[in-house]
């Protein structure tokens, strides 16, 4: 997807002049970025102390909301399984794609009334996104359990004859049932050893019923054969079979159990289909809610940081840049030249990225203008 740089700079004589200067520097001759004004309404400023504290709180809230947005997006990809190419078309904000939403951002006055204090607005966002995060955990847990149980049953019916469930393969007629003396065993015979089996099975132990073995099924490597013998000879037969590389499966024909397993699999499969639609709808709705909340947090951060840096009265222009990937470094240099006068301590930062002890931000994250990255690459396909 796309990376955006959300920046702000103080108004020149007017905010429009600030905008025009940016456009001239980044788009006129060099096509460094695609830009849009980022509209932030007149929010309540409050006291300086509150703004300083809020700056730290908003940084944490930003990380939390971004994490929730990514979790919802990633879980949608997991739920859609084979349709992962369709994930992106389901990741919408307010019914439009994410790039459109960000570049045409309008503050949601109904959800986040600007008559409220900045702290109250941030608390409304935190409460809403925490609810989404908790609901996601509960819904994901329930759906994952269902999916896991179904996969376990499906796994039992897949794989080689040595490990898979045989319930779907055998029939009642393949067994001698309800006999006091006789029992039918199921034996996995490697294809390379099948001729040995035919010659030997009647003499592997005493009391094997002659000509009682048939091939019931096969896979790439083996045949599944039945054989009937007296119950008292079973242990001896198992031992001799193992010596000859024939694997006797532990299997008892039980129609009740087999029917119950089949019904359980059908039930789980039906439940999964029933839950799938509502779950995807919930993910779409709540992805949109979380993403919208995230961009409002970015707007709050730009507002607070701009007031702290540029002072009162509030006079700054927030601008959204979509950098051209090939010229990101050049764009940074142009922005630096444009705004280096705002902060003398920013001199040489562009050339010397390093960490300064005691500062939360590493040098490469600090610029003379207010800057926040919005990364719309929300999915990590495994």
UniProtKB/Swiss-Prot annotation:
Subunit structure and binding partners: V-ATPase is a heteromultimeric enzyme made up of two complexes: the ATP-hydrolytic V1 complex and the proton translocation V0 complex. The V1 complex consists of three catalytic AB heterodimers that form a heterohexamer, three peripheral stalks each consisting of EG heterodimers, one central rotor including subunits D and F, and the regulatory subunits C and H. The proton translocation complex V0 consists of the proton transport subunit a, a ring of proteolipid subunits c9c'', rotary subunit d, subunits e and f, and two accessory subunits.
Listed InterPro entries: ATPase_V1-cplx_csu, Vac_ATP_synth_c_sf
Organism: Xenopus tropicalis (Western clawed frog)
CDD domains given in the database record: V-ATPase_C (cd14785)
Protein name listed in UniProt: V-type proton ATPase subunit C 1
Molecular function per GO: proton-transporting ATPase activity, rotational mechanism
Keyword list, A-Z: Acetylation, Hydrogen ion transport, Ion transport, Transport
Modified residues (N-acetylthreonine): 2
SUPFAM superfamilies associated with the record: Vacuolar ATP synthase subunit C (SSF118203)
This protein's GO CC annotations: proton-transporting V-type ATPase, V1 domain
Family: Belongs to the V-ATPase C subunit family.
Role according to the record: Subunit of the V1 complex of vacuolar(H+)-ATPase (V-ATPase), a multisubunit enzyme composed of a peripheral complex (V1) that hydrolyzes ATP and a membrane integral complex (V0) that translocates protons. V-ATPase is responsible for acidifying and maintaining the pH of intracellular compartments and in some cell types, is targeted to the plasma membrane, where it is responsible for acidifying the extracellular environment. Subunit C is necessary for the assembly of the catalytic sector of the enzyme and is likely to have a specific function in its catalytic activity.
